[in-house]
């Protein structure tokens, strides 16, 4: 039996001064974690106990679909160079040299190592599919560690990798992971949403994130409460309401003086129109395409509706990953002969196709393509131009969905208002394709004896993030509560006076009875005031408390549900049934 008096559970009444988010404050106060250095934490008894339960759930579900490996955290430079990621990872990677001068790194993820095993060991389609996973410590030289366990430099991750003979096989492996992740997060008691995501540096053809809504999050997700639509704002779309175009004031573009009006809102108000009828112009310098001979930057101008924001991830996809930087005021003046705040699309010879690297590119957001009689900068100080119709008043290189979805816009599936909120990512699944098997030379023979590349998937879960997301979802002023499946203990039995032999003995018997019934129990046998014990019990995340006090002489104890604050007096025979009902996972 676990006795509180024999354990080290260093609870604190005050949160650390640098703690900003609830999970950081409470996990430190509850004695789960202690900071060793920036972004580096020790797990104390309660924290380690919870983490082990989380890891156990993940392992059980992953064993149903794959095989567990354990790979080295220390990786040679050569294997990361083979994939091209030694340079790509930059300062995020911890790098070191051994005594002989050989360069190594601490693994951030293990696509390369798993692919190397596949390259050496897999020979035939008969050996596929394969799903290999591990649960291991990872390292990332995070530039600004913060928010407790949410942004760290050392973390525990479940990463898995699938190898299939073709895309149809990858679809199956991907779905197996999707379903396993849903089971894992359901068992961990999390409220989560599965969203379509941008694959980013991972590459590949498909990607989904498992996200938990919390104000501590850094990723924005758009979701619909009326249907299943959910997407990271990097990928999210929405239906746009019809906008009434302005009536033309002339048959051709017309110059209009706008003295002292600099912002879109100021110009719109001055002209008596909505920002929805104005064009927002953004100017960038774009890196030369890979393989370009001269390596010169190319001008890129993006046009959005006046009330819309640019989605940089969508822009990156539209220009095929070429790096961009904002144009300086001097560059705008030199290239377009326009003051920076008055740049517009008129009187510029734009590239007709994206392959034309000699002229500036002009990209339109889709919301502007069919609009008429818009207002934009006139490339002249304190002047704008109206009656602009894209494709007539000026030509453009191309169009794409480039805007950021906003709160309340209609869902693309059902038209219901979208919710946009902060989230924390707890899991991510990718269809990697052939990126690593191609780069590292992994090949197998197909059923016709032809040498082909296996197709890959990559799948990750952040273990600490399951714990922190749960705390973020379930806390109040007094502390937090964890779902029974991942709480360090399910029940704390608290005698209100350990000096009273009957109460102390009764509490021991109740704790033993609950343990025999299969509950994970801690007995708070400390010689402390009841108020101190109750505060600690509320703080440390245990879902049920049993107070053994004055009514024990009547054969009753007080049973308290931490999350709902429901309290009732129960007889000893009733306790097991009541607690079992409370702790049963919701369907």
UniProtKB/Swiss-Prot annotation:
Keywords: Aminoacyl-tRNA synthetase, ATP-binding, Cytoplasm, Ligase, Nucleotide-binding, Protein biosynthesis. One of its GO terms (molecular function) is ATP binding. CDD domains: ProRS-INS, ProRS_anticodon_short, ProRS_core_prok. Its EC number is 6.1.1.15. One of its GO terms (biological process) is prolyl-tRNA aminoacylation. Its main location: cytoplasm. It is an enzyme of class 6 (ligase). Belongs to the class-II aminoacyl-tRNA synthetase family. ProS type 1 subfamily. Consists of three domains: the N-terminal catalytic domain, the editing domain and the C-terminal anticodon-binding domain. NCBIfam families: PRK09194.1 (NF006625), proS_fam_II (TIGR00409). This is Proline--tRNA ligase. It comes from Koribacter versatilis (strain Ellin345).
